[in-house]
Amino acid sequence: GFIFQGFNLIPALTAIENVELPLIYRGMPAGERRRLAKAALEAVGLEKRMSHRPAEMSGGQQQRVAIARAVAAKPPIIMADEPTGNLDSGSGKEIMDQLSELNRQGTSIILITHDNKLAEMARRIVTISDGHIISDRAGRGYA
């Protein structure tokens, strides 16, 4: 799964339809798609926004739809580009807690961030500058 910094939601689709879209491409049956999409949206606190389109949601809500889309199918790896960048600190903590739980369940998380506090939550921190690894060290260990 991939969590885009810029959401990349389809404006004409509702939140639940945006989350279901990658599941369609996996060939998943409609009932299972709907169940997984609903559970993912509930997990990010958007159970009351499932029928809303992106233009009807705040930036933080759109980011949470993007996160739900990435995690709905429980992929083995999630690449997250600034996943909490558009969220308030409380919502950001909830998202990081969710990513941590996914990691405990066996999902690998690759987190791209400029936020040092967020980076410190990881088990391993690789710092890249101009395309080169300049450090590779242990973090405090969320994931």
Identify the residue ranges that each predicted region occupies.
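Conserved beta-strand-loop-alpha-helix hinge in the C-terminal portion
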Residues: R124, H132-A143
